[in-house]
């Protein structure tokens, strides 16, 4: 399970997820990627389940990059506890994902295998996602520069 080794503060505010992802929105390491289309908190267990699904699908071929990390602690109070008495203790960790963020990348496998592996990972995640390739992004980037 992914979680930070050390943190400055044990409890953080919930925050808001507004706008598009400005960082991590391009396929940088691999050839294929899985892009988030909705904002969400992705838990460390969901990231791990998606990673296992992908690695089992591609077997020993190819390489997988996880481009999100759960930095945010989510607190919970025990069941049947009265209100007040402070904030609860950290229960699990989440990664804050905005639309446009590339969450996983793959390389070293044919496109059909990559599509299948990322499709399996999609089903482990609580949001709508999209399969993207590095070539698609380079073409789109070139069109934007010309206009």
From Swiss-Prot:
User: Which InterPro entries does the annotation name?
Assistant: Ribosomal_uL16, Ribosomal_uL16_bact-type, Ribosomal_uL16_CS, Ribosomal_uL16_dom, Ribosomal_uL16_sf
Fill in the subunit field for this protein. Answer: Part of the 50S ribosomal subunit.
Q: Where is this region: Disordered?
A: 1-20
Question: In the UniProt record, which is one GO cellular component term?
Answer: cytosolic large ribosomal subunit
Q: Which gene encodes it?
A: rplP
Cystine pairings recorded for this chain: none
Q: Where is the composition biased (Basic residues)?
A: 1-16
- Protein name from the UniProt record: Large ribosomal subunit protein uL16
Natural source organism: Alkaliphilus metalliredigens (strain QYMF)
Organism's domain of life?
Bacteria
**Classification via CDD domains:** Ribosomal_L16_L10e (cd01433)
Family the entry assigns? Belongs to the universal ribosomal protein uL16 family.
* Protein keywords: Ribonucleoprotein, Ribosomal protein, RNA-binding, rRNA-binding, tRNA-binding
Statement: the UniProt record of this protein carries the keyword NADP: no
SUPFAM superfamilies found in the cross-reference section = Ribosomal protein L16p/L10e (SSF54686)
- Quick check: keyword Phosphoprotein in the entry? no
Q: Which GO terms describe its biological process?
A: translation
Known function: Binds 23S rRNA and is also seen to make contacts with the A and possibly P site tRNAs.
Q: What Pfam families does the database record attribute to this sequence?
A: Ribosomal_L16
Single GO MF descriptor = rRNA binding
